[in-house]
Amino acid sequence: MASTATNTDFFKTLLSPFSNGNAAQRSSRQNIVWLNRKQSGNNNRSLRVNGLFGGGKKDNKEDGQSKAGILGNMQNLYETVKKAQMVVQVEAVRVQKELAVAEFDGYCQGELVKVTLSGNQQPIRTDITDAAMELGSEKLSLLVTEAYKDAHSKSVLAMKERMSDLAQSLGMPPGLDGLK
């Protein structure tokens, strides 16, 4: 019984600024409700605060902000992020299609061999001149490798530039290391 009196005194001192305050304080009192419960003959009091997180409203309006409370309208944020992801996916597919039809030619020294790759680094064709064929298989192998490396570097550079342009068009800051 002594603990109940101590708890009551504690809450009275906690609520003392509301007892004879100004109008703003009196309106704040509407959000504090004392609950009386009888439990096995004892009169226990508990304090419920309805003012936090938008609880305790009498009108049941279905506005997003009152439902979300202090966190804001999470549903609208989720939908905005979802739309942004869809835009990124659509633009990325568009860039991939552009790269798939683009062709990049690579040459060896003396342009005896020409290798053509797509923007997705897929080989399309290899052109070998008669002069390169006369050099022998070992030298021809080196020339084809050199031309392939040249075409590959041009294709990768073009892909990075297009992806960087895509990132900048979507509002990402320029110069991200992962895109260059």
UniProtKB/Swiss-Prot annotation:
Residues 45-65 are annotated as: Disordered. Its main location: plastid. It is found in: Plastid, Chloroplast. Residues 56-65 have a biased composition (Basic and acidic residues). Coiled coil: none annotated. Homodimer. Binds to the translation initiation factors TIF3E1. Binds to DNA and alters its conformation. May be involved in regulation of gene expression, nucleoid organization and DNA protection. This is Nucleoid-associated protein At4g30620, chloroplastic. It comes from Arabidopsis thaliana (Mouse-ear cress).
